[in-house]
Swiss-Prot record:
Primary gene name: RTN3
Keyword set includes ATP-binding: no
Name of the protein in its database record: Reticulon-3
GO biological process: apoptotic process; brain development; endoplasmic reticulum tubular network formation; endoplasmic reticulum tubular network organization; negative regulation of amyloid-beta formation; neuron differentiation; vesicle-mediated transport
Location relative to the cell: Endoplasmic reticulum membrane; Golgi apparatus membrane
Length: 1032
């Protein structure tokens, strides 16, 4: 019954494989076999059910003092639930407090297969279990994990309607918490085994979970950690109290706990509704709107959990136990930031009719058909970012949390793809997304790996939004995880534990071109700003048997552009051009295809074993399909982290190896192919190294060869069918120094000149709106042209930012200059026009050319009358008469309006009120404008006067003297006022006459000018002095 070997069968959920044989009565993967089978001890079955269940449970945590354990070993009444206190924070760190990657398992049939973590220190804890004497008693004890919700073998507290594989989640804290059940009501009257095994130093705490009946199996339950109980518990009344200074609950006795949870099991789904996750009544749209929720996690300063979330009972035995619990909890607060990174998210729904192949999932992953998200945990800031993964059943994305990732063997995928579950579990895995459209095609070997090597994990470390194939490996579990089918929904996993050995940043095997006809109907794998950071931890490449090539091949024919426009969602998030910096994570292979038209006979294959590469993503403007890979890993390496390869090679070694391989690379200029020779001959079939994807009028993609401006690099390729546009580059762009930037500036200048020369021929191919240019991402050139690639990239980015009002990037700089000059000239014209209006309230040109006859006639008549008056009378008399005339008019009009208003009894107000309200004040600005204009003329006049009178030029001074002598004769004949009258007549008559008879006047003026010139020459010829000067 209680066999010592059976005690070690489940000694550690992470260091053993739980090899409970299906033939063993209590070793089945279903905990339902535990209460039904009384001939066999239930310890192993309880442990198996604890890790192989598949539904989320309410969590309860038992915590008592260490004294209770010793009293339990010494024949204390079995009604007490004895659990161990927590170790100190230093001891827990020594035992490797982690959120175990290994705590995930798959059930094949009814046999749970659990991969072990490979921790040696856990074995030490397991060896301590064998030291205790093992006797038979009436208490049920699990040697490694306590049975969830007080479940014991003899009197089942789990309803009979439970699914075959209920889920339990056990978080190893380096301690074993033992729940000792008081009474065992086995139908056969047989007591269970190992009642007091490993109670002294083997301390653990267990997150116990409730279960769901099959009728509620499709519903999404709340997933809780740290004894987050349902908000309401039906059945018997439950007294809920917070244990002092403790986020965990203390339950007094098992009977009340069993009775309490028996009813809570039945209503766990309904009770979780308010603050957990969605129910099955919610639609996919509702789920998708709320799929970015993260449940609030308690930290050190956040206070207590809600009352409804804790099934807390006051421990009533001793005050010492409470003090012990409080002390232990205070110790636990030292590392709660890492523990609380356990996230609570829903999981993909399982088909209930395939219970024999039911997949075991941990509590953090609920089985829902709706979308879920991957929170990638930033261990430094304890922030959670969620990543929706494309659902296999073709409905909505799947999400999985960071804490414990269950590898879901999705049976729906097999049903859709029509492929049977293969027997070889470590064979090639594929991530084939089947859409809801009828034109979806089947994809084979999207991610091909050699047999025996589990699929590699795919992280998308992006500040933008990436659509990538995400494949999760279980390499750090010593490659012992068996996968159930070849169509696994495997997702990114991030270890949030404190152990540096478990902190992994895996390779990026991003395949954005995998079967776009499947991506289009699916919500693509959207990973917004998922950055995995590990504070002060080493980053290790987890071994994967053999470091083989990640091949992206067998791309089938893509669907039409219209279907892509209809189905592909906008996941770009308006990421700017060339935002993706190069990541330093090894084996970063992205094969990008144009999503519009790709020849199915020519798949793009990107293979790069054991070589770090940098990814420059293409943004497909048409479908807003982008892959942004940031430099998180590179920045971590700059901060002193150590990125380790399989053979523990440093990043420098990897770069050196890649450099050697790059030096061996052969650039075939005719075919523009880049061949990298490495351990496996890897062929990079690329297009001309610098290419830009543009969106043409037909909705497809058009490759416009910007690189053709560099004639030594590439050839012009126009059309709608792109070649492979993804070369690899060994060194990141961040390493370019100032000299390269100077070369970039030089190249930009040369390119600008060439663009002006080729503007006429290139404009036809370069028609692209500025918004589209801003959205496009340019590919890097191969290894042999890293600087030129960076130059072109920067040039394109600058062109995109400089577009502004121009839609032709070829002539953008010239257009900008023209616009600037034109705008400047317009501004000057406006200023001149303003000055002219300030100097003269009307245009003199319009006046003298009689553009407005009324205005010109009024001005001409008034000035002529005034001049005639001055000719007949003195100036004083003229001015006085003019003022009297004006006043007589205004006063008469004012009296007239007043009389009219009095007769008509109207109150129109002052007749000149509109003119009185006009602001005629001269501002300082206007005065300065007047003065500036006047000073120009005044200074010119002063300079001319000084020049003439001081005889700077004798000839000019003589000319002035002759002119003044002639004016004496004019003054003797004409008065000054007469001259002014004549001048006014000429000003208002000559321009209009000249404009009307310009041709004739110019002819006669030319004749007169020629005659005058001939006469002057004759006179100068007779003067000897002037003739000699001209001869010299």
């Amino acid at each position: 019954m209680a066999e010592p070997s059976a005690a070690t069968q489940s000694h550690s959920i992470s260091s053993s494989s739980f090899g409970a044989e299906p033939s063993a009565p209590g070793g089945g993967g279903s905990p339902g076999a535990c209460p039904a089978l009384g001939t066999k001890s239930c310890s192993s079955s309880c442990a198996d059910s604890f890790v192989s269940s598949s539904s989320s449970q309410p969590v309860s945590l038992f915590s008592t003092s260490q004294e209770g354990l010793s009293s339990l070993c010494s024949d204390e009444p079995s009604s007490e639930i004895m659990t161990s206190s927590f170790l100190s924070s230093s001891e827990i760190h020594n035992t490797g407090l982690t959120i175990l990657h290994g705590e995930k398992s798959h059930v094949l049939g009814s046999q749970p297969i659990l991969a072990k973590e490979g921790k040696d220190h856990l074995d030490l804890l397991d060896m301590k279990k064998m030291e205790k004497p093992q006797g038979t008693s009436n208490n049920v004890s699990d040697s490694s994990v306590s049975l969830a919700a007080g479940v014991h073998c003899d009197r089942p507290s789990i309803p009979a309607s439970f699914p075959e594989h209920p889920a339990f989640l056990s978080k190893k804290i380096g301690q074993v918490e033992e729940q000792i059940d008081k009474e065992t009501k086995n139908p056969n009257g047989v007591s269970s085994r190992e009642a007091k095994t490993a109670l002294d130093a083997d301390d653990r705490f267990t997150l116990l979970t409730a279960q769901k009946p099959p009728t509620e199996y499709s519903k999404v339950e709340g997933i809780y950690t740290y004894s987050l109980s349902p908000s309401k518990v039906s059945g018997d009344d439950v007294i809920e109290k917070d244990s002092p200074e403790s986020p965990f609950e203390v339950i007094i006795d098992k009977a009340a706990f069993d009775k309490e949870f028996k009813d809570s099991y039945k209503e766990s789904t309904d009770d979780f509704g308010s603050w957990s996750v969605h129910t099955d009544k919610e639609s996919s749209e509702d789920i998708s709107e709320t799929n970015d929720k993260l449940f609030p996690l308690r930290n050190k300063e956040a206070g207590r959990y809600p009352m409804s979330a804790l099934l807390s009972r006051q421990f009533s035995h001793t005050n010492a136990a409470l003090e012990e619990v409080s002390r232990c909890v205070n110790d636990m607060h030292n590392f709660t930031n890492e523990i609380l990174t356990w996230d609570l998210v829903p999981q993909v729904k399982q088909q209930t009719d395939k219970s024999s192949d039911c997949i075991t999932k941990t509590t953090g992953l609920d089985m829902s058909e709706y979308n879920s998200e991957i929170p990638v945990v930033n261990l430094k800031t304890s922030t959670h970012q969620k990543t929706p993964v494309c659902s296999i059943d073709g409905s909505t994305p799947i999400t999985k949390s960071t804490g414990d990732w269950a590898e879901a063997s999705l049976q729906q995928e097999n049903a859709i793809t029509g492929k049977p579950v293969p027997d070889s579990l470590n064979s090639t895995k594929e991530f084939s997304i089947k859409g809801v459209q009828g034109n979806m095609q089947k994809q084979d070997d999207t991610l091909a790996e050699l047999p025996g090597s589990p699929p590699e994990k795919c992280d998308s470390l992006g500040s933008g939004v990436a659509t990538v194939k995400v494949v999760l490996p279980d390499d750090h579990l010593k490659d012992e995880m068996d996968w159930q089918s070849s169509a696994l929904g495997e997702i990114t996993e991030a270890d949030s534990s404190g152990e540096s050995d478990d902190t992994v940043i895996e390779d990026i095997t991003a395949d954005t071109s995998f079967e776009n006809n499947k991506i289009q109907a699916e919500k693509p794998v959207s990973i917004p700003s998922a950055v995995v950071k590990t504070g002060e931890r080493e980053i290790k490449e987890i071994p994967s048997c053999e470091r083989e090539e990640k091949t992206s091949k067998n791309f089938e024919e893509l669907v039409s552009d219209s279907e892509l426009h209809q189905d592909q969602p906008d996941i770009l998030g308006r990421s700017p051009a060339s935002e993706a910096a190069c990541s330093k994570v090894p084996d970063t292979n992205v094969s990008l295809e144009d999503v519009s038209e790709v020849a199915p006979e020519k798949p793009i294959t990107t293979e790069n074993p054991k070589l770090p590469s940098t990814v420059s993503p293409n943004v497909f403007n048409e479908t807003e399909f982008s892959l942004n890979v940031t430099t998180s890993a590179y920045l971590e390496s700059l901060h002193g982290k150590n990125v380790k390869h399989i053979d523990d090679s440093s990043p420098e070694d990897l770069i050196a190896a890649f450099t050697e391989t790059r030096d061996k690379g052969i650039v075939d200029s005719e075919r523009n192919a880049f061949k990298a020779i490495s351990e496996k001959m890897t062929d990079f079939k690329t297009t001309p190294p610098v290419e830009v994807l543009h969106e043409n009028e037909s909705g497809g993609s058009e490759i416009k060869d910007i690189g053709s401006k560099y004639s030594e690099q590439s050839k012009e390729t126009n059309g709608s069918e792109p070649l492979g546009v993804f070369p690899t580059q060994g060194t990141p762009v961040a390493s370019l120094d100032l000299e390269q930037e100077q070369l970039t500036i030089k190249a930009l200048k040369e390119l600008g000149e060439r663009q002006v020369e080729k503007s006429t021929s290139a404009q036809r191919d370069a028609e692209l709106p500025s918004e589209e240019v801003l959205k496009q991402t340019f590919t890097f050139a191969p290894e042999s042209w890293p600087q030129r690639s960076y130059d072109i990239l920067e040039r394109n980015v600058k062109n995109g930012s400089d577009l502004g009002i121009s839609q032709k990037p070829i002539t953008i700089r010239e257009t900008t200059r023209v616009d600037a000059v034109s705008s400047l000239s317009k501004t000057e014209l406006v200023k001149k026009h303003v000055l002219a209006r300030l100097l003269t309230d009307f245009s003199v040109h319009d006046l003298i050319f009689w553009r407005d006859v009324k205005k010109t006639g009024f001005v001409f008549g008034t000035t002529l009358i005034m001049l005639l008056s001055l000719a007949a009378f003195s100036v004083i008399s003229v001015v006085s008469y003019l003022i009297l005339a004006l006043l007589s008019v205004t006063i008469s009009f004012r009296i007239y309006k007043s009389v009219i208003q009095a007769v008509q009894k109207s109150e129109e107000g002052h007749p000149f009120k509109a003119y009185l309200d006009v602001d005629i004040t001269l501002s300082s600005e206007a005065f300065h404008n007047y003065m500036n204009a006047a000073m120009v003329h005044i200074n010119r006049a002063l300079k001319l006067i000084i020049r003439l009178f001081l005889v700077e030029d004798l000839v000019d001074s003589l000319k002035l003297a002759v002119f003044m002598w002639l004016m004496t004769y004019v003054g003797a004949v004409f008065n000054g006022i007469t001259l002014l009258i004549l001048a006014e007549l000429l000003i208002f008559s000559v321009p209009i006459v000249y404009e009307k008879y310009k041709t004739q006047i110019d002819h006669y003026v030319g004749i007169a000018r020629d005659q005058t010139k001939s006469i002057v020459e004759k006179i100068q010829a007779k003067l000897p002095g002037i003739a000699k000067k001209k001869a010299e």
